[in-house]
Amino acid sequence: MTNMTLRDLLNQQDATKFATDAGTRAHRRMQQITIDGDTVHGDADTVARIKLFPELLPFFVANAQTEVPVAGIIRGKFVSRRIDRMVTNHDKRQILVMDYKTDVSPDKFHNKYYAQVCEYLELLRAIYPGYTVLGYILWLHDFRLEAVQ
C-alpha cells in the first residue's frame, strides 16, 4: 500500500478531470464533422486531419448519426449505451459503428473499450437482423482506426 499525500490525491483528481474535459471537447468537435462530397462542416483542422485518412471518410457522410442511443438485453441483463457515430446504409444492409477514444496510451483500457464496442454490435445486430454491423475504435491521438470483431 502506498502512502498518498493530499497533494498527490488532488493532483490525480486534477489529471482525471483534465482528461475527462479534454475527451468531452474532442467528442463535441467530432460530432460536428461532415465530409460528404462538397459538403464539409466542422472544425477545419479536424476535417483536414480526417481527410488524410481515406478509410475514415465513410464515417463522416451527411447521414451519419452521432450520440445514438441503443438498448437491449445482453446475457440476460438490460443494457443501455450511446454510440459516438453510426452510419446506416439500408441499400447495402450495412451499419458502421465508430467509438472515439482520446487515450494516448490505449493499452490500459483497451479490453474495456473493445468490449464496449462489441456490446454496440450485439445490440444493433438484434435490432437490425440481416444487416452486416461493423464496429471500430477511432484513436483520436493518431486517428488510427481499429476494427472490432
Where are the regions a protein language model picked out?
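Mg2+/Mn2+-dependent nuclease catalytic core
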Residues: 77-149
